[in-house]
C-alpha cells in the first residue's frame, strides 16, 4: 500500500513538473507578452495604498498579465521604510519571513501576492539599508546609521526578489544616491530581459540610455511620479514635458518597449501611464486631467527577437485643463518668434531660426478657423529654439538642443509654456509642419520627436514623419514633419528634443586637442 502511494505521489510530481516546463516553453515561444501598467492615486496611509495594490493584482482586468508595473512613490514613505533583499541571494520574503520579523509586512504581503497570482510584479518603495553594509562608501552616514533609497523591487512569479534598482537621479528628494550608479536588469520566463529605471532617470544617459547602448536591452519597466512641464517635458511633450509625451518620444527614438506606470494626482501635476512599442507608438496610454484614479491598463506587447548591436568601446565614469498643475520651461532663454496669424486667412512660414551657433529650419502652413467670437479667446503660436544647459536648482543637469512650435496664451514669450484656460480655443488648423535640423555628433546623445495635443496626449507615429541620417562624422540631419494630407487643429507642441546629457565629446565643443581625443579627424574650433 505504501509502495503504491509513493509511486502515485512521484507520478503526480513528475506530471506537474512536465506541465510546468511545457507552460514555460509555450510562454517563451510566444511572439508577445501581456503587460499591465498601473495609474495609481496614492493616499497618506500605507495600509490603504497596499490594499489598492492588492485589489489591482487580484482584479479581473489583471488576469491575463504576465507582468504588472506600479508607479513611483505610491506605496510607503520615509516613516515606513523597509529592508530589501539582495537579488543575488534569491530571497522569497513570503516564504523566508512570513511573520515579517525582518522585512516590513507590506513587502512580505506583496511577495505573497506575486506568488499567489503567479505574475511578475514591479513596485517602487522607500528602502532603508545599513551604512555598514557598504564599506566602500566612505561618504558621511546619517546619525541613525541608515541610507534611504528610492528603489524599484521586482518579484518573480514565485515571489522571489529577482531585481532591485536604486534611483540615480533624484528629483529634489531627501534620499541617498548609491556610491556608484546601478545598472539593473532581470530575465523572465517568457523570454524577455527587462531593464529598469525611475522617473527623472529618463533624461540621462546612465542608466536608461546606457542599458540600450551597452547591453542591448529592448524592454523596460518605468515607475514614475512625473511633474509635467510645458511645452517640452510633459510626459509626452516637447520643450516642457508631460509624462506620456516623454514616454512615447523616448520609446520611439530608441525603438524599445516601455512599460510606464505613473502616479495619478493631476492637481499637483502627476499623471501619465502607457505601454509603448517603439516605432509603432502607444499600445495603451492615459493622461488624467481632472482627478486621479487607481486603474490598470493592459496590452499585448510584441517581442523584439533580433539582437541589438552594442557599443563595447564606451568607457564610462562614474491640457488645456486648469485643474492639471504643470511646470513651465525656461522659455525666456529661447530665441523665438510669434507666428503672424490673420483671422480668416491662410498663412505660412519658411524660416531659419538660430540660438548661438545652433539653427533650425521651419516650414509651416496653416488655415485660420475664422474670427474669434466675442466671449472666447484663442491661443497663439511661436517657433522657438534653445541650446544650453537645462538647469533646475538642486537637480542633476543636462545639455539640450531643442527647437519647435508651441502655444502661448498671449503675444509675449511670458505667455507661453503654461496650461491654457478651458475657454481658449485653437485659432488655426496646421496643414503642414516641418522642421529640419543639423545636429552635431556626440559620444552620448538622444534625439526624439516631442509633440502634444490639447488632450495632453502626443501624436502617434502614424501621424508624423521622422528621419535621422548621419551625413558625416560630425553631424546628423533630422527631419520631423506632419504626415502629408494630415491636418491638426489642437496642437500644443511640435518639436525635436535633443538631449546631449553632459555634452562630452560633442563635435565642435572644446579645444582641438579634446576633439581629436574624442576621435574627430577634423576638429571644429
Swiss-Prot record:
Tissue expression profile of the protein: Expressed in third instar larvae.
Glycosylation sites: 20, 61, 99, 116, 124, 176, 333, 348, 375
InterPro entries: Biotinidase-like_euk (IPR012101), Biotinidase/VNN (IPR040154), C-N_Hydrolase (IPR003010), C-N_Hydrolase_sf (IPR036526), Vanin_C (IPR043957)
Domain CN hydrolase: 33-303
Keyword Glycoprotein: yes
Gene3D superfamilies attached to this UniProt entry: Carbon-nitrogen hydrolase
Active site per UniProt: 72, 167, 199
GO cellular component terms listed in the entry, alphabetical order: extracellular region
Induction entry: Induced by ethanol.
Signal peptide extent: 1-27
Keywords: Glycoprotein, Hydrolase, Secreted, Signal
Pfam name, any one: CN_hydrolase
Compartments where located: Secreted
Protein name as catalogued: Vanin-like protein 2
Organism, scientific name: Drosophila melanogaster (Fruit fly)
Lineage of the species this protein comes from: Eukaryota, Metazoa, Ecdysozoa, Arthropoda, Hexapoda
Amino acid at each position: 500500500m505504501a509502495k503504491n502511494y509513493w509511486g502515485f505521489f512521484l507520478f503526480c510530481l513528475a506530471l506537474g513538473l512536465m506541465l510546468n516546463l511545457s507552460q514555460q516553453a509555450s510562454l517563451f515561444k510566444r511572439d508577445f507578452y501581456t503587460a499591465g501598467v498601473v495609474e495609481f492615486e496614492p493616499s497618506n496611509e500605507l495600509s490603504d495604498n497596499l490594499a489598492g495594490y492588492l485589489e489591482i493584482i487580484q482584479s479581473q482586468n489583471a488576469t491575463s498579465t504576465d507582468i504588472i508595473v506600479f508607479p513611483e512613490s505610491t506605496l510607503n514613505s520615509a516613516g515606513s521604510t523597509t529592508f530589501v533583499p539582495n537579488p543575488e541571494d534569491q530571497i522569497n520574503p513570503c516564504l523566508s519571513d512570513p511573520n515579517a520579523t525582518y522585512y516590513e509586512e507590506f513587502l512580505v504581503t506583496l511577495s505573497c501576492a506575486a506568488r499567489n497570482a503567479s505574475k511578475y510584479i514591479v513596485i517602487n518603495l522607500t528602502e532603508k539599508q545599513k551604512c555598514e553594509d557598504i564599506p566602500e562608501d566612505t561618504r558621511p552616514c546619517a546619525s541613525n546609521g541608515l541610507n534611504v533609497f528610492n528603489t524599484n523591487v521586482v518579484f518573480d512569479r514565485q515571489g522571489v526578489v529577482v531585481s532591485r534598482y536604486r534611483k540615480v537621479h533624484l528629483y529634489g528628494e531627501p534620499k541617498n544616491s548609491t556610491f556608484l550608479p546601478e545598472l539593473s536588469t532581470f530575465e523572465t520566463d517568457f523570454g524577455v530581459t527587462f531593464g529598469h529605471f525611475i522617473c527623472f532617470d529618463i533624461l540621462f544617459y546612465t542608466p536608461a540610455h546606457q542599458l540600450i547602448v551597452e547591453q542591448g536591452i529592448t524592454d523596460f519597466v518605468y515607475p514614475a511620479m512625473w511633474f509635467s512641464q510645458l511645452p517640452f517635458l510633459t510626459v509626452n511633450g516637447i520643450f516642457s514635458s508631460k509624462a506620456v509625451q516623454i514616454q512615447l518620444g523616448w520609446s520611439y527614438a530608441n525603438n524599445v518597449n516601455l512599460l510606464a506606470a505613473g502616479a495619478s494626482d493631476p492637481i499637483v501635476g502627476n499623471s501619465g501611464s502607457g505601454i509603448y512599442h517603439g516605432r509603432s507608438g502607444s499600445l495603451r496610454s492615459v493622461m488624467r486631467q481632472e482627478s486621479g484614479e487607481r486603474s490598470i491598463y493592459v496590452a499585448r506587447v510584441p517581442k523584439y527577437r533580433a539582437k541589438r548591436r552594442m557599443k563595447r568601446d564606451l568607457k564610462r565614469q562614474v491640457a488645456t485643463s486648469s485643474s492639471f498643475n504643470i511646470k513651465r520651461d525656461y522659455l525666456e532663454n529661447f530665441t523665438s518668434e510669434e507666428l503672424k496669424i490673420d483671422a480668416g486667412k491662410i498663412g505660412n512660414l519658411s524660416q531659419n531660426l538660430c540660438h548661438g551657433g545652433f539653427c533650425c529650419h521651419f516650414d509651416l502652413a496653416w488655415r485660420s478657423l475664422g474670427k474669434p467670437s466675442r466671449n472666447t479667446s484663442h491661443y497663439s503660436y511661436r517657433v522657438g529654439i534653445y541650446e544650453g544647459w537645462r538647469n533646475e536648482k538642486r537637480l542633476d543637469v543636462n545639455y539640450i538642443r531643442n527647437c519647435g512650435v508651441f502655444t502661448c496664451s498671449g503675444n509675449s514669450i511670458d505667455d507661453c509654456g503654461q496650461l491654457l484656460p478651458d475657454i481658449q480655443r485653437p485659432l488655426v488648423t496646421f496643414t503642414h509642419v516641418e522642421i529640419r535640423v543639423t545636429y552635431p555628433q556626440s559620444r552620448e546623445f538622444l534625439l526624439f520627436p516631442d509633440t502634444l495635443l490639447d488632450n495632453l496626449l502626443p501624436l502617434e507615429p502614424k501621424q508624423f514623419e521622422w528621419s535621422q541620417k548621419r551625413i558625416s562624422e560630425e553631424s546628423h540631419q533630422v527631419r520631423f514633419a506632419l504626415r502629408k494630407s494630415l491636418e491638426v487643429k489642437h496642437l500644443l507642441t511640435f518639436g525635436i528634443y535633443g538631449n546631449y546629457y553632459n555634452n562630452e565629446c560633442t563635435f565642435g565643443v572644446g579645444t582641438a586637442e579634446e576633439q581629436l581625443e574624442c576621435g574627430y579627424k577634423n576638429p571644429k574650433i
